[in-house]
Design a protein with these regions (language model features):
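Glycan-association/targeting regions that enable binding to alpha-glucans and other polysaccharides
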Residues: 1-143
Length: 143
C-alpha cells in the first residue's frame, strides 16, 4: 500500500476517522510506524492490533506519544504516536502476511483506521544481502 501520509486525502481521512496511519517502515526486527490522531482530549490511548494468521489470533501493542502538531487551516491540533510491531524471525522465511489496524480510544469512544475495511497488509520477505564489490576480496569478511 502507498504510505498514507503521501495520499492526497490524508487530511480528510484523519478528520473523518479521528485516527490515521501516517507511515510504516520495515526492518529485520519488525515494523515501525507513526499514527496521527486528532487531539480531542488530553487522555487518550493509541494502539495497533495485528495478526500473522488471518485474525485467528491477534496481538496488540501500545503506541507512544511522539509529538504534537499545532492546529492549522481550521483543523484541530494533531498528536503523533509511534509504534513498533516485533516480527518473529521464523515468520520472515514463510512469506507470512502481517495485517494490522490502528485503534484510538478517547472520551469513551473508539476509532479505527483499518485501511477502509481492508486492513493494512504487508508480506514478510527476505532479501539476500549483497556484499559490496570492493569488499569481496577483503579479509574483513573472514573475521
Amino acid at each position: 500500500f502507498q504510505q498514507p501520509a503521501d495520499c492526497p486525502d490524508f487530511s480528510s481521512r484523519l478528520q473523518e476517522q479521528q485516527v490515521c496511519l501516517e507511515r510504516v517502515t520495515s526492518s529485520d526486527l519488525g515494523l515501525s510506524g507513526t499514527i496521527q490522531v486528532r487531539n480531542v482530549a488530553f487522555e487518550k490511548q493509541v494502539s495497533v492490533r495485528y495478526t500473522f494468521n488471518q485474525w485467528e489470533s491477534l496481538h496488540e501493542v501500545c503506541a507512544r506519544w511522539h509529538q504534537s502538531i499545532p492546529a492549522k487551516n481550521g483543523q484541530d491540533q494533531v498528536d503523533v504516536f509511534t509504534f513498533f510491531l516485533p516480527v518473529p524471525p521464523f515468520l520472515l522465511q514463510l512469506s507470512t502476511l502481517v495485517q494490522f489496524a490502528a485503534r484510538y480510544q478517547v472520551n469513551g469512544q473508539e476509532y479505527w483506521d483499518n485501511n477502509r475495511g481492508k486492513n493494512y497488509t504487508l508480506t514478510c520477505q527476505t532479501h539476500p544481502l549483497k556484499m559490496p564489490r570492493e569488499c569481496e576480496e577483503s579479509w574483513i569478511h573472514f573475521i
